[in-house]
Amino acid sequence: MSFPVEVLAGIAIELQRGIGHQDRFQRLITTLRQVLACDASALLRYESRQFIPLAIDGLAQDVLGRRFTLEGHPRLEAIARAGDVVRFPADSDLPDPYDGLIPGQESLKVHACVGLPLFAGQNLIGALTLDAMTPEQFEVFSDEELRLVAALAAGALSNALLIEQLESQNMLPGSSGVFEPIKETHMIGLSPAMTQLKKEIEIVAGSDLNVLIGGETGTGKELVAKAIHQGSPRAVNPLVYLNCAALPESVAESELFGHVKGAFTGAISNRSGKFEMADNGTLFLDEIGELSLALQAKLLRVLQYGDIQRVGDDRSLRVDVRVLAATNRDLREEVLAGRFRADLFHRLSVFPLFVPPLRERGDDVVLLAGYFCEQCRLRLGLSRVVLSPGARRHLLNYGWPGNVRELEHAIHRAVVLARATRAGDEVVLEEQHFALSEDVLPAPSAESFLALPACRNLRESTENFQREMIRQALAQNNHNWAASARALETDVANLHRLAKRLGLKD
């Protein structure tokens, strides 16, 4: 059987009709699935010894969130090494990466598979995969015909990557000015909220502006900081991380600015602080809202003048550091309450970013679940970890108060439970493997709600609510602060600090 000229022309036309790359890619693989009458098709990008799905048709949605490493998927490794059309026989010993991921056929193995490596010159840039439940599905198509399809797909992908590279070098009008393409390996999500966030990251990454990253706990603010650093001219230099919430007041200044020998008891040698470590690079200050006012003043001076002073030293050191800061607090409210310096807030928030909570990201929940399933599969040495349709619906219907971090923990816990109840190395996650309900966390009793004063302002009511939550967590965990922190899904240092601010401890 040969492709009619009209079919190839139709594929080429479809590649030009899309508004953006994603739309073109989707049109391509949808058209190919129809023309080849197969059950599933996928376009994958090759990067750092792994294949990243760009567009799929006929596969479960969570495939878009998975990252297929060559080491973990022998068929994809064979495609990457082949340099030409690869046909896998129905009795192939190599597991198919999409087994259990074709909707309606979850319990059946994929029988026929064709892999088409995609090249730009001599460089592997991606692959097309075609799968069918019928063993002889692709025998009617010659290798030459499939090479034509691969050439069309490679051209589309190569053009998209070239445009991305040109935009990253500020060579196109209206481009973002990003120094190099941002790798989106861990920035998973196609929702409007995440698409907007990625655009904003691209805009600010190539500049040298300080960035304030806001968002609820567990949304992935550290990943945003990493993406900004990777897309900046400073990417060749260090990205240094510091959690301000975990800093005891007595050592916070030394951690930030360093100290000299003899500056205080225990200072037995000179020590560089985080600012020195990040010189010519980027410093990420997580939970910036937890810094004391005294340290805020010293941080402001560094941002204003670019010099630091080690504890116990009279000399100043010049540093060139870009500061990225993150917080789950409303710093405007903190400024009004006198807990955060207004001048520091304005210095940090030159370009503010907001990471959306998971409940506002729609189907991204499923994509992220696929990513974590693949992580668990590799970590535990399983042949496959897939979500049942019921499990997908269950994940979509939950509110995720702990955001992406809670989803990650839920997937890991579900895999362990499912593995314990099923023999073999194949795991299917069902709804019953997830303990997702609004009463998972300790909740205030009805009596405690009634006991709260009804005429307080919002801040006072919020603080009363926080006090009640902490009291109940402590009571339910025998006043063990570490266990209470785990129950409330916060770190123990942050819980101690909050309890002290709320007057629950000295």
Curated annotation (Swiss-Prot):
ATP binds at residues 215-222, 278-287. Keywords: ATP-binding, DNA-binding, Nucleotide-binding, Phosphoprotein, Transcription, Transcription regulation. Residues 187-416 form the Sigma-54 factor interaction domain. GO terms for biological process: phosphorelay signal transduction system. InterPro entries: AAA+_ATPase (IPR003593), GAF (IPR003018), GAF-like_dom_sf (IPR029016), Homeodomain-like_sf (IPR009057), NorR (IPR023944), P-loop_NTPase (IPR027417), Sigma_54_int (IPR002078), Sigma_54_int_dom_ATP-bd_1 (IPR025662). SUPFAM superfamilies: GAF domain-like, Homeodomain-like, P-loop containing nucleoside triphosphate hydrolases. PROSITE patterns: SIGMA54_INTERACT_1 (PS00675), SIGMA54_INTERACT_2 (PS00676), SIGMA54_INTERACT_3 (PS00688), SIGMA54_INTERACT_4 (PS50045). GO terms for molecular function: ATP binding; ATP hydrolysis activity; DNA binding; DNA-binding transcription factor activity. Pathway: Nitrogen metabolism; nitric oxide reduction. The modification 4-aspartylphosphate is found at residue 57. It comes from the Bacteria. NCBIfam families: PRK05022.1 (NF003451). This is Anaerobic nitric oxide reductase transcription regulator NorR.
